[in-house]
């Protein structure tokens, strides 16, 4: 699985066990992602941050 990094056009290959890509946003500003990468379990959203997870190459 390949997941996008925060830097445009950059991505990384996920290590074994991390089979989801994620994008993290601040709830106050949903247009600008704060963090992107590989993860094993999609975190729950909170009052301040929202996560979007997916399982195809560079889907984040």
From Swiss-Prot:
Matching InterPro entries: Cytotoxin_Cobra, Snake_3FTx, Snake_toxin-like_sf, Snake_toxin_con_site, Toxin_cobra-type
Disulfide bonds: 3-21, 14-38, 42-53, 54-59
A cellular component annotation (GO) from this entry: extracellular region
Protein's GO biological process: killing of cells of another organism
Database matches in CDD domains: TFP_snake_toxin (cd00206)
GO molecular function: toxin activity
Main location: secreted
Family: Belongs to the three-finger toxin family. Short-chain subfamily. Type IA cytotoxin sub-subfamily.
Known role: Shows cytolytic activity on many different cells by forming pore in lipid membranes. In vivo, increases heart rate or kill the animal by cardiac arrest. In addition, it binds to heparin with high affinity, interacts with Kv channel-interacting protein 1 (KCNIP1) in a calcium-independent manner, and binds to integrin alpha-V/beta-3 (ITGAV/ITGB3) with moderate affinity.
Oligomeric and partner information: Monomer in solution; Homodimer and oligomer (homohexamer) in the presence of negatively charged lipids forming a pore with a size ranging between 20 and 30 Angstroms.
Protein name: Cytotoxin sagitoxin
